[in-house]
């Protein structure tokens, strides 16, 4: 409950999350008990909503709360349930030194665990729940093991190396699921394609576009999945495809793909800086007819891809603005009485 509440309200304090988690657990224990009144949950959730709307509410603050509280009944409950904070950018959690960890753990193991779950889940709120559960579970196991070890620092170092894959999986999935949630599937696919174009500008649109679409499909399947191995399995398969398609083209990619661990290989690919821009002829803009055809979106994406591979140092944010602008222009002009005049004017 602490993890779920902290993911949902990533900017809330530990105390606010504690109040919310306590109320949710109490409601579940009362209403799921044998012989509980059938109206128990409805009455309990109504009381919880009323408490959320009170002036002295102990729950996480949200700018949308007042709007929800202006509604009544089921609409109010659904509105409050849908509220969530934006993800932390970048994640704020930093692991303290082993000595500090053990001191806090030995003082109060339960409080230590609860505070860690809150801080970690708040920082990586967009990582899939199974990934977060696995990562937090192994870390708490590490603390309980290493704090009774005769050599705690050596123990923490050894365990950190063993947890590296899971830590990277949490970092990667949080980053891409945040992007996916904020941008939507189409723009996230383009962002991924543009990043590939800048890392491997020698590769063509036909080579890189399927990789971007494959990544988008993987994240669309796994970001909200409760399957335990979804993200690791999909990311490993995607890494194999990327390595197979690009290793022969780029020595840097080949070096990243040389390892035995697909998740670490993928992180290496992710960390590659943009390559020098190749000497290429000027990119051809889509014609007005192409822009408004059934394949108009693909023509626009291809043109922006060509810009990205010719200008490998242009930041993702600017390419994203160009993508949004091209979409807006097509939406405005293609249904117009004279699309060509509209497009030329834009």
Can you say where each PLM-predicted feature lies in the sequence?
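General marker for long, soluble alpha-helical cores
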Residues: 1-346
């Amino acid at each position: 409950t602490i993890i779920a509440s902290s993911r949902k309200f990533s900017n809330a304090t530990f105390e606010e999350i504690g109040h919310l988690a306590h109320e949710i657990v109490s409601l579940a224990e009362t209403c799921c008990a044998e012989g509980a009144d059938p109206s128990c949950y409805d009455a309990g959730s109504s009381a919880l909503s009323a408490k959320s709307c009170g002036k002295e509410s102990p729950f996480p603050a949200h700018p949308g709360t007042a709007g929800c509280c202006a509604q009544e009944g089921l609409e109010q409950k659904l509105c409050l349930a849908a509220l969530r904070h934006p993800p932390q950018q970048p994640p704020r959690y930093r692991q303290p030194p082993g000595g500090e960890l053990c001191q806090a753990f030995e003082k109060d193991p339960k409080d230590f665990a609860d505070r860690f779950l809150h801080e970690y889940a708040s920082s990586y709120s967009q990582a899939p729940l199974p990934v977060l559960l696995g990562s937090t579970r192994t870390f708490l196991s590490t603390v309980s093991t290493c704090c009774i070890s005769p050599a705690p620092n050596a123990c923490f170092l050894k365990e950190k190396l063993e947890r590296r894959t899971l830590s990277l999986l949490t970092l990667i999935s949080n980053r891409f699921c945040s992007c996916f949630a904020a941008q939507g599937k189409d723009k996230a696919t383009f962002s991924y394609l543009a990043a590939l174009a800048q890392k491997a500008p020698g590769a063509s649109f036909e080579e890189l576009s399927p990789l971007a679409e494959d990544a988008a499909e993987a994240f669309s399947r796994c970001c909200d999945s409760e399957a335990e191995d979804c993200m690791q399995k999909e990311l490993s398969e995607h890494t194999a495809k990327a390595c197979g398609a690009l290793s022969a083209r780029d020595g840097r990619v080949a070096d990243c793909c040389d390892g035995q661990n697909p998740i670490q290989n993928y992180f290496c690919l992710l960390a590659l800086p943009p390559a020098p821009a190749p000497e290429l002829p000027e990119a051809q803009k889509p014609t007005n007819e192409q822009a408004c055809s059934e394949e108009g979106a693909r023509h626009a994406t291809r043109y922006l891809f060509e810009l990205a591979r010719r200008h490998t140092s242009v930041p993702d944010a600017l390419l994203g603005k160009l993508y949004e602008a091209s979409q807006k222009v097509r939406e405005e002009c293609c249904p117009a009485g004279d699309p060509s005049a509209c497009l030329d004017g834009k």
